[in-house]
């Protein structure tokens, strides 16, 4: 419902206004344009082959199965605009332009951004949340933030070479909205 009006309003740059995980194929027959795009991290992969025919799929195997000689994976954070008739690449742009200048002197902004990202991804879900809980920083930070926000989740740990002391301490931090299991 929102993509076509956004495209009509902004043209191919409508992609820059999107937020989230996506792989998009938009065919504009009226203006003979084909637009393909991944999200910033290519969470949703997009494989394609553009030659005599156009093939786009989420899996490389789907493109290969049609005997196209060279399936290509669209890079993360990229959108391309092709002329639908000639198959010529008209433009390639980044979905988001990262500012990598280092000017922060503390972690305050990071903490706010991390909390916001957890709220965004954990809010309004139709399914229950589960996380793979290891003794590493990533899953520990996610579990900590979910607990802080009282967001219900279930954690699973496959015990192997994990630091068991760290895992035991993390399991003690579960609140009434969270629980975990060792596998």
Listing of model-derived features with the role each one plays in the protein:
Residues 1-183:
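Cysteine-centered catalytic environments shared across enzyme families
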């Amino acid at each position: 419902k929102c993509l076509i009006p956004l495209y009509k309003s902004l043209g191919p740059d409508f992609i820059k206004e999107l937020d989230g995980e996506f792989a998009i194929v938009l065919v504009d027959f009226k203006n003979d344009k084909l637009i393909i795009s991944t999200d910033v991290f290519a969470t949703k992969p997009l494989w394609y082959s553009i030659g005599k025919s156009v093939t786009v799929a989420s899996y490389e195997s789907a493109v290969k199965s049609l005997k196209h000689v060279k399936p290509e994976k669209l890079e993360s954070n990229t959108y391309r605009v092709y002329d639908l008739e000639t198959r010529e690449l008209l433009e390639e742009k980044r979905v988001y332009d990262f500012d990598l200048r280092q000017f922060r002197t503390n972690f305050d902004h990071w903490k706010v951004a991390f909390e916001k990202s957890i709220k965004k991804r954990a809010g309004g879900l139709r399914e229950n949340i589960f996380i793979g809980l290891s003794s590493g920083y990533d899953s520990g930070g996610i579990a900590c933030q979910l607990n802080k926000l009282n967001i219900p989740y279930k954690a699973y740990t496959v015990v192997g070479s994990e630091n068991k002391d760290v895992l035991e301490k993390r399991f003690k931090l579960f609140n009434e909205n969270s629980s975990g299991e060792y596998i």
